[in-house]
């Protein structure tokens, strides 16, 4: 059993963020802890929302944990709401990394070629700083474009451009990268670039080179929180010893099966009720 810390927002009315990730990681055999970056009334797509940042709580909590000697095998960061939060979490992750903790960064910012409602260019800069401390980061294609300043193309990329984008993300400081919701040579896919040395806490197989691409058939139904589900399944498998490509395939299968089972749900903003679907993990 690995000790995993999630640093992300908590949304009151939706299965997204930590609400989606915690039951998955627990089901996969890990002990899960949390440090909320904000309390959010509902997903931002509704147009009306209330957000209470928890920066002061975070600032007070981290020294307490340090004094008590709490240790984590992995930490996964998500949405940051201020420069102060990003610096606080970035410094904490660097300290944990020096102690042997694996750092995962989900640079939550946008989708479909646009930033999420309420996001700004400053958030992009903050996420670049967070990616710089990551053992593994997993942006979607839109977020990868913002991170790398590569223009978003609805038609997607060719393989050479895909590899260049992965290289650009690694150049920010991440040791390995996944890009979800990508489109390469006319096929929907997830892209990966593995480290040329073993990542902390999980195995690699570079016999077929550092890059990989896994195609998938898109289901014409979208839900909030599927990125969080993807991340949680990948982290759970990686921390159980699977390599990056195996973990990516497991995540893709779980997300596909969850969407298929819940495709008749009316409000996509509510996300997927993961607690009712743990058998699909």
Tell me what each language-model feature is.
Residues 118-212:
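Conserved phosphate/ATP/ADP-binding segment of small-molecule kinases
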Residues 146, 221-244:
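Short, small-residue alpha-helix embedded
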Residues 160-170, 212, 243-259:
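Short, well-structured alpha-helical segments that form the helix of a local strand-helix-strand
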Residues 1-105, 109-117, 276-281:
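Conserved N-terminal subdomain of the carbohydrate kinase-like
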Residues 11, 38-40, 81, 109-111, ...:
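Glycine-rich beta-alpha junction loops
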Residues 12-13, 210-224:
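Short pre-catalytic strand/loop immediately N-terminal to key active-site residues, enriched for Gly-Thr
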